């Protein structure tokens, strides 16, 4: 698509799917002319040498990346299926997390997750979404832990 549209820039990060959040490494794709103009605007200090070394190693191990992404997708599929069974409203998307509406039980459940070493985020600070929890997706075995706690709590 980037060669088809002269004004399209696709930006990606290695942070989530590759497990490199601390490296702050990303990349972009654009047609040659646009990429050159963007290259001229780059900051003085781009990526550090450690980030370069880590990304090079990760890219060499493409099978690991694909396996990890497939495991995450299986975990997501499992979690969404279980949330439907529990009749919990959720916001799905293409990110590595979902938001689950827990109503007034949100605060209590946050504490229970914390006690069980499952770290989650409070959710959306937007009117109408205050009772949503943000849960990061992971492999199915991790999502089973989340579902077990949800089921136990909602009994």
Residue ranges and their predicted role:
Residues 121:
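Active-site catalytic microenvironments in core metabolic enzymes, especially phosphate/sugar-handling
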Residues 72-73, 77, 82-116:
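Conserved PLP-binding catalytic core of the aspartate aminotransferase-like
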Residues 38, 109, 146-149:
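Hydrophobic side chains in well-ordered alpha-helices
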Residues 29, 99-103, 136-138:
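Short hydrophobic/aromatic beta-strand micro-patches
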Residues 7-84, 88-91:
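PLP-dependent aminotransferase class I/II
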Residues 22, 94, 127-131:
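Short acidic/glycine-enriched loop/turn segments that link adjacent beta-strands
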Residues 115-116, 125-155:
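PLP-dependent enzyme catalytic core of the Aspartate aminotransferase-like
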Residues 1-5:
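Short, conserved loop/helix-junction motifs that constitute active-site signature segments
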């Amino acid at each position: 698509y980037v060669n088809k549209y002269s004004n399209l820039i696709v930006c990606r990060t290695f942070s989530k799917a590759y497990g490199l959040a601390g490296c702050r490494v990303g990349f972009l794709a654009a047609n040659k002319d646009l990429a050159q103009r963007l290259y001229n605007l780059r900051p003085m200090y781009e990526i550090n040498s450690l980030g370069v070394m880590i990304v090079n190693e990760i890219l060499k191990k493409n099978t690991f990346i694909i396996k990890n992404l497939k495991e995450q997708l299986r975990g997501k599929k499992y979690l969404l299926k279980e949330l439907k069974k529990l009749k919990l409203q959720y916001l799905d998307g293409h990110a590595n997390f979902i938001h689950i509406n827990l109503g007034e039980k949100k605060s209590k459940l946050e504490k229970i997750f914390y006690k069980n070493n499952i770290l989650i985020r409070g959710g959306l600070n937007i009117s109408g979404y205050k009772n949503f929890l943000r849960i990061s997706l992971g492999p199915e075995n991790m999502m089973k832990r989340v579902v077990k706690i949800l089921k136990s709590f909602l009994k």
